[in-house]
């Protein structure tokens, strides 16, 4: 943590095709080795596949999928008197988005489809229907928080 001042958030330019800041942020999560144009191709390709299969607009499905993945609570380790407790804490909105996007991309990378665009599209469709490994990850995190609810008074 900085001692002098809090560092401000950087402005992210909205993506060129849909004008969405959320989608631009998502492309940055998908990007590897600074290859932004490749990340754009993957994301736009996935959104086209999703729109064809689901029959809804590109952004609508993306936001539905992300809504079903975003966690509301998570656990953080807190050391109290020699023992470590998993303390449930509420997730801030910015972190909520970041975790949801990261889990979506991680789940897509572990899938078996041929191209990354197909994997991402399949994971988005699953997430929009409350299925898939990204949604499972969110449920696991919520289950951990629920199991450790007794330690909620150790919040800081």
Curated annotation (Swiss-Prot):
Molecular function via GO: rRNA binding; structural constituent of ribosome; tRNA binding
Top-rank taxon, per record: Bacteria
One Gene Ontology cellular component annotation held by this UniProt entry: small ribosomal subunit
A Pfam family that the UniProt record links to this protein: Ribosomal_S7
Keyword Ribonucleoprotein among record annotations: yes
A biological process from GO: translation
Job description of the protein: One of the primary rRNA binding proteins, it binds directly to 16S rRNA where it nucleates assembly of the head domain of the 30S subunit. Is located at the subunit interface close to the decoding center, probably blocks exit of the E-site tRNA.
PANTHER family: RIBOSOMAL PROTEIN S7
Family: Belongs to the universal ribosomal protein uS7 family.
Protein name in UniProt: Small ribosomal subunit protein uS7
Protein's organism: Pseudoalteromonas atlantica (strain T6c / ATCC BAA-1087)
Lineage: Bacteria, Pseudomonadati, Pseudomonadota, Gammaproteobacteria, Alteromonadales
Gene: rpsG
